[in-house]
Amino acid sequence: MQAATETIVAIATAQGRGGVGIVRVSGPLAGQMAVAVSGRQLKARHAHYGPFLDAGGQVIDEGLSLYFPGPNSFTGEDVLELQGHGGPVVLDLLVQRCLELGARQARPGEFSERAFLNDKLDLAQAEAIADLIEASSEQAARNALRSLQGEFSRRVHALTEQLISLRIYVEAAIDFPEEEIDFLADGHVLGLLEKVRTELSTVQREASQGALLRDGMTVVIAGRPNAGKSSLLNALAGREAAIVTDIAGTTRDVLREHIHIDGMPLHVVDTAGLRDTEDHVEKIGVERALKAIGEADRVLLVVDATAPEAADPFSLWPEFLDQRPEPGKVTLIRNKADLSTESIGLEESADGHVTITLSARTGAGLELLREHLKACMGFEQTAESGFSARRRHLEALRLAGQALEHGHSQLIHNGAGELLAEDLRQAQQHLGEITGAFTPDDLLGRIFSSFCIGK
């Protein structure tokens, strides 16, 4: 536990007026401040109703005082909470009183940072506090709560323990060569390595789902000119975000619209129609469209259901096939069902391709698309599954997987125990970055500075 020399104070509730406002204090002076502000000795971990006093003994406000001696507190330090009325003037007066008594204004996220430094939370749990506050849907809030309760961290720790066991075995064999262990022939090493790689892939998949719920999914609408891409964007956005005409090539640049489906964030990107063109401006738009396709979480490939080429849309554009994400991230949209003989509906092929027939103009079938996008974002997860994750977590998991892949290759092709041991060490270090076991101070500063003041 790291003993703080400074006492910090901040308003812990949201800005503005409210029924209740909370001022939070943490540090070695919290106990003295409890007596000075309340005018009496407070019993630990009990709520005391009474006045909050200024330096002259005048009443600032009335409310509840709660004192939590460390280490049994949120930060691991002595903590004082003053719960009064939620007026900004009253709360500012309480903060000023604490500043007079020797505290300083807390930095954003400093309470959570102290909890992390005092081993009350690991880094993934601390980040989950901010994720829970910022959650834009019930599912995102549930995932953040599970991360705060340690679900993500437990999964990472389990992977780390498996890596440590494998490292001990491999490095012991290296240190005692007289045992003459053949790493390639030793099925124990290969079996453990395969097991940890499989479990890491599972965690990566669930973390990716959690990150989509937290950050939102980027959906790119792509297709031929005049397929109804801009009409689909407008239908999803619920407003005229894009210009719609019968003239092919109206959209020449990338248009971005941020929407919510049942509180779940969605970043929808409308792109220029994919076609060969001599128009310089339109050509730039097509290049940007292909770039957006390559960066998308999901691509909605829109085809005009009344056009002859709609029968086999995936064979139309080699450029799209080169730039698209993995096939499982492409949804085929057969638009203009109101002008064709096709029925509104959703079909899933044996190989997992989803096709939705709809009409962007009338809105028929649009609810099917919304439900499909929600499912792609993990909306159907139960309360007992899923956890919140961030982009930095995904990168750490990716690098850990890359190290294990390299180690596996070294083992299979070279039987190289020394190189495998180094790859295992690197994988463990990348996993440690998630929970804060191997996290640089500058990264910690950036993470906690993004928190609310008072958290």
Curated annotation (Swiss-Prot):
Q: Where in the cell is it found?
A: Cytoplasm
Q: Which residues bind GTP?
A: 226-231, 245-251, 270-273, 335-338, 359-361
Is the tRNA processing keyword given for this protein?
A: yes
Which parts of the sequence bind K(+)?
A: N226, T245, I247, T250
Main localization of the protein?
cytoplasm
Listed binding positions for (6S)-5-formyl-5,6,7,8-tetrahydrofolate are R24, E81, K120, K455
Chain positions recorded as Mg(2+) binding sites: S230, T251
Q: How does it assemble?
A: Homodimer. Heterotetramer of two MnmE and two MnmG subunits.
What this protein is called in its record is: tRNA modification GTPase MnmE
